[in-house]
């Protein structure tokens, strides 16, 4: 049977740790859950199509539902703060000293495009968990899909986790303002 196995990179972590990966379907954001499946008029009544059916919204799209419920999330193990340091540069503080290497500042990538509205300086997640996959399988590591509410944007990559299940860094850029991520926030 083909299975995804998560291997802890830290000896003290287990399946009950707050950073334990979880199925995306168990961590659907509130804004998605609370969105209306059918369009409402300004008076609160549902809009009706000529055939008498309700007018669907984006939430009724099966392709969007599949994206919002497929895969696994990697998460932050503690609170993380992005701030402007005394050199007037974006910096990061990981609130738990045992997890200081979870998020680190990286060397510049001058020839790699960066999205508008994000700092040119970039960081990397060093996840608490590695992924082990059956022979012939690879994993797509991406910014959490359709999560425009997060204050960072991750670089996307594919890793052959059937051959490599060592911890890997996952580069990302922070939005051009200070922000804080709470523990258990999804990062990939």
Task: Specify the residue positions occupied by each region the protein language model found.
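Non-catalytic terminal segments and appended small domains
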Residues: 1-167, 175-179, 184, 188
